[in-house]
Amino acid sequence: MSWDVVARKEFRDALRSKGLWVLSLVFTAFFVIPAGAALWWDVGIRGGQEVGLQLLIEYIYLNIVTLFLPLVAIFAGYAAISKERTSGSLKLLLSLPHSRKDVIIGKVVGRCGVVGVPLAGAFIVNALFLIASRLTFKPGLYVTFALFSMVFALVIVAVAVSISGAVENSLYSIIGNMTFFVSITFFWNLWANSIGDGLGEYLGVTGAANWTTVLFLKLLNPSQAYKTIMNSMLGDGSNAERLARYRMFSGGNNSEQATICSDVLAGNATEVPGFMGNRTVCQESAQSVPLYFSDGAALFYLLLWIGLAAAVSYYTFNQYDL
C-alpha cells in the first residue's frame, strides 16, 4: 500500500502552491463576513441572542456551504488526475511502485487535506468573530456544524477527484464536475418529484409508497443529506429529526402532508388553523423516525458517494491505456 506516499506528495505540493492560500482566504471570507455582520450589526440578533447562532447557521451558513463550498471543492479536485494524464507525468508516477488504486486513493486523500486544512482554519477564525459578537456562542452546536460541513466538503472533493480519474482530460473533468454540481444544487429535488409523479401516473404507486420513494431519492442527494442533517441538529426536542425530513416537502394538500407525516415519518399529523385556512403540522408521536430516514441513514447516504465515486473512477481509470 503506497497511497499514503501519493497523498503526502499531493499535500506537500499544495503547500507550495498559492492555490492553497487562495482557498484559505476564500473559505475565511465566506464564513467571516456573516460573523462580522453579527458582530457589528443586528444580523441574527432579531430572533434573540440565545437563538441567533441557530438562525445564522440555518439561513445563511447552510446556503453558503451548499452553494459555494462545492464550487471551491471542485476547483481543488477537478484536475488532480486528468492534468497529470495530459502532461504525461502520470506515466512517471505509475512507473514507481504505485498501483492505479494507490493513485486514486492517494489523490483523494491528498486533495481532501488540501481543502480540509484551510476550511478548518476558516472555522477557527470565524469562531473568534462569533465569540466576540452579541450572539450566544454555543460551542457544541458550532463544532457540530463545522464537522458536518467539513464532511460534506470532503465528499465533494472525493467526487471531483474521482471524476478527474474517470475522464481523459481536464476539460471533460470540469464539464463532468459542473454537471454534478448543477444537478445536486438545482435539479435533484425536481427529478425526485418528477419520478414520484411518474410512479403515480403510470404505475399507480400512490400514497405512502410514493412519498417514501421520493423522500429516499431526495436523501440520496449529498447536498440535501447534509442540509437535512444540519436542520435536525438545529432543531429542538425529540421531534427535530422528523421535522427536518418533513420540511423537505413544500406544497401539496393537507391529505398529502398528513400521509407524509404519519405513514412515511411515523409522526402525528394534526390540522391547525392557518392564515390561508387549515394546514397540517407534523407533531411528535410515540414512534421514532424509520431507521432508513434517520440522521444516521442520511449520513450513510452522504458518505456512500465517496465509495461509489471511487469505485466508478477506479474501474474507468483502470481501463485507460496511458
What is the predicted role of each segment?
Residues 21-25, 170-188, 200-207:
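Pore- or pathway-lining transmembrane helices of multi-pass membrane proteins that form conduits
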Residues 41-44, 186-299, 304-307, 311:
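Terminal transmembrane helical anchor/hairpin motif
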Residues 73-77, 125, 159, 175, ...:
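Hydrophobic/aromatic residues in alpha-helical transmembrane segments
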Residues 1-27:
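Aromatic- and glycine-rich beta-strand/loop motifs that create alpha-glucan
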Residues 33-40, 47-72, 110-172, 176-179, ...:
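Secretory targeting signals
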Residues 70-85, 300-322:
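Transmembrane alpha-helical segments in integral membrane proteins
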Residues 13, 83, 96, 127-131, ...:
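Transmembrane helix-loop junction
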